[in-house]
Amino acid sequence: MFQVQCLESAQKAATENVAKFCIEPLSKGQGITIGNALRRTLLSNIPGTAIVGTRISGVDHEFSVIPGVKEDALEILLNLKQLVFKGNLNEPIITRLNIQGPCIVTAGDIDIPTDLELIDPQQYIATITDFSHLEMEFILEQGESYVLSEKTASNNPRGFLAVDAVFTPIKKVNFFVETSSSKERLEKERLIIEIETNGSILPLEALNLAAERLSSLFKLVNSADLTAEFPTEVENIVQVSQTDVTGVLIEELELSVRAYNCLKRAQIHTLGELLKYSKENLLEFKNFGQKSANEVCENLHERFNLTLN
C-alpha cells in the first residue's frame, strides 16, 4: 500500500526545522525520478518573503560608514539577508525601523504589519554605540528561489540599496533510494528524502506544496493538445564534448540504486565530478564493486561517449 511516512522531525533552532520522510513502495527507477523532481521543485519553486531593498538615512552607497553604528552599510545588508519572514504578500510593501542608541538592533525592532511574522525577532542587525538615531526602510516582496541584488536593484526606488533576496524557505534537501521486496517478490524501491527549512514553513508543508506544484504541471502537460512533426531525414548526431557535460547530474546516467547511492555518498553529484576519478578509484569506495564500476563506465560511454581516466 502506497504511503508517505515522517521518520524524523525536529526543530533545532527558530530558523532550522528538519524532517525525514519515506515514500514507498515505488517501482524500480521511480525513486530517483521522483526524488530528483521533488528536490528541484523544493529548492526552486517554494515561495517565500524577503527584503529586496533598504534605505538607510544618511547612506548613499553600500560602502558608506554610518556615524554611531558599529557596522558599515555592507555589513548591515549581509545581516538583513538572514531575516526570515512568514506570511503572504500580494504586492511589495515598505516597512520601517527608527531607533536611538546606544543599543543592539535586532529584527524585532522592525515595524511590520500584523499579517507578517518574524521567525526570529532576536536576529542581529547592528549595534548603535552612542546616542545616534538609526532610520531604515525596507522593501519586502514575495518570490521564489534566490535573486541577486543586481536584478532586484532595477525595481527599487531611488535611494534604496539592493539586497540579495533569499526567497526560498528551503535550506537543504537530500534524498537517497533503498531497495525492498514486495509480497509478490518484485523488487521495489523506497525514497528517503530529508528537508530542512528556515522555520517559515514546516518540512511536511513544503513537501506537500512541491508535490502539488508537480501534479499541476503534469496535469497541464496531460491536457495539452500535443502534436509532433518528424523530419523526413535523420539529422546528424552531434557528439557532446566533455566540457558540455560537466554540470550534468549523475541522475542522467540512469544507474542502479546501488551504484547511484555509492556515488552520492562519495559526494559525486555531476559528470564533471565523476570524470575526475578512474575506474580503479571507484572500486575504492565503500560497497562499490566491480559490477557497479562496469555499469558506470558502460552508461557513461553509451549516453555521453565519455570514458573515465
UniProtKB/Swiss-Prot annotation:
Listed SUPFAM superfamilies: C-terminal domain of RNA polymerase alpha subunit, Insert subdomain of RNA polymerase alpha subunit, RBP11-like subunits of RNA polymerase
Entries under InterPro entries matching the protein: DNA-dir_RNA_pol_insert (IPR011262), DNA-dir_RNA_pol_RpoA/D/Rpb3 (IPR011263), DNA-dir_RpoA (IPR011773), RBP11-like (IPR036603), RNAP_asu_C (IPR011260), RNApol_insert_sf (IPR036643)
EC number(s) from the headed UniProt entry: 2.7.7.6
SMART domains: RPOLD (SM00662)
Compartment list: Plastid, Chloroplast
Keyword match Cell inner membrane: no
Region called Alpha N-terminal domain (alpha-NTD), residue ranges: 1-225
Entry-linked Pfam families: RNA_pol_A_bac, RNA_pol_A_CTD, RNA_pol_L
Annotated family: Belongs to the RNA polymerase alpha chain family.
Domain notes: The N-terminal domain is essential for RNAP assembly and basal transcription, whereas the C-terminal domain is involved in interaction with transcriptional regulators and with upstream promoter elements.
Function statement: DNA-dependent RNA polymerase catalyzes the transcription of DNA into RNA using the four ribonucleoside triphosphates as substrates.
Summary of subunit composition and partner proteins: In plastids the minimal PEP RNA polymerase catalytic core is composed of four subunits: alpha, beta, beta', and beta''. When a (nuclear-encoded) sigma factor is associated with the core the holoenzyme is formed, which can initiate transcription.
The name this protein goes by in its record: DNA-directed RNA polymerase subunit alpha
